[in-house]
Amino acid sequence: MTTLSHPAVAESLPTETLLGWLRDMYLIREFEIRTMQAYQNKKIGGFCHVYIGQEAVAVGCVAATRKNDPLVTAYRDHGHGLARGMDPKYGMAEMFGKLSGCAKGKGGSMHFFDAANSMYGGHGIVGAQTPLGAGLAFATKYEDEVMGGGKSDKVTLCFLGDGAVNQGAFHEAMNLAGLFDLPVIFIVENNGYSMGTAIERGTTMAHDLGAKARANGIDHITIQGMDVMSVYDGMKPFVDQCRENSRPGFVDMQTYRFKGHSMSDPRKYRTKEEEAEYEAQDPIGRLERVLKTQRDVADTDMEAIYDAQKKIVRGSVEFAENAPAPGLDELYKDVYVEPFGPWTGTSLPEMLANDPNYNGGAR
């Protein structure tokens, strides 16, 4: 299949749009800094994977979509949720295990969820979100075209790490997406390492991940993911094409995480020189320079935006600290679909057992 080219369109966008991207990246960066502090202070339990260094990917990709386009991702999910519009206080409360969290404190860091913004979760099993991405695309297409009788115009974004391309579920999802013409874009956030394993050591065709898309008849592009303007330039026409022809796509999004795979990762598999090389390409610094040199935005204006995001995140931490913990009764909620009631200790959910239309399980 042809590797698609893309024009430079971000340069023509209003300064206010670029400042909005900068604001969102500031928010993600500050949120993750405070997340690390809270984790180190043992206010956050479980696993924790921060998004520092990769902010341009989530912000640029989301900017290229509509709010009702489904999004699903892996366990490094904070950036995607915030970029999609999740209120950071509900994300922070989730990691603190509080009832007011975006998943009632039951998901934690790896399982942000915000249906109001079409963010269908972070998922903890490597590659497990890829069949869900294909399924979301199938659902929107079926709903719009079969049930609605029109043409589907939704595009699902399915984010995954480079390690997930080695999982069988990913290849099955790609095959079905190509076979059924599903409008899903698989975005590989290729930060070069699957936990501590360099991509060249664990993945065939590491220099050309697009080969995996071509094998399934899927168009693909490669994007420089350390620059939010490049991300938007690549994603906007690609998303538009997927929306128009209702076909899948594949993106090799080349990026770099500044921190470890998780909070417990000492990063001994990377050299200090390598890390310094990529930190010099900080996506936030890149956009700051563009705004300063090409849009005449003053340093003080950008500092004011950052200070505002810091205040929002501080408020989110305070909200999470003061939010109520879930009661023991929450253990029995969200187990069954709500119309069929909570578990009551009997062999059947209460409302289902009391339903006059229930036939005792006979078929």
Task: Identify the role of each PLM range.
Residues M1-R76, R84, D301, N322-A323, ...:
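N-terminal amphipathic, basic-rich helices that act as targeting or association modules
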Residues T2-L4, Q241-R363:
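Glycine/aspartate-rich loop-and-adjacent alpha/beta segment that forms the canonical ThDP
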Residues M36-Q37, N41-F180, A198, G202-M205, ...:
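Cofactor-binding active-site loop characterized by glycine-rich and histidine/acidic residues
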Residues G79, G192-M195, R257-K259:
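Short gly/pro/ser/thr-enriched loop/turn and capping motifs at secondary-structure boundaries
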Residues K141-S152, M205-P237, A280-Y306:
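Conserved thiamine diphosphate
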Residues F170-A173, D233-D240:
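Glycine-rich, charged/polar anion/phosphate-binding loops
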Residues P183-F186, D219:
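Short, proline-centered helix/strand-breaking motifs
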Residues G192-I199, I218-Q224, R267-A276, T300-M302:
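Short beta-alpha connecting loops at secondary-structure transitions
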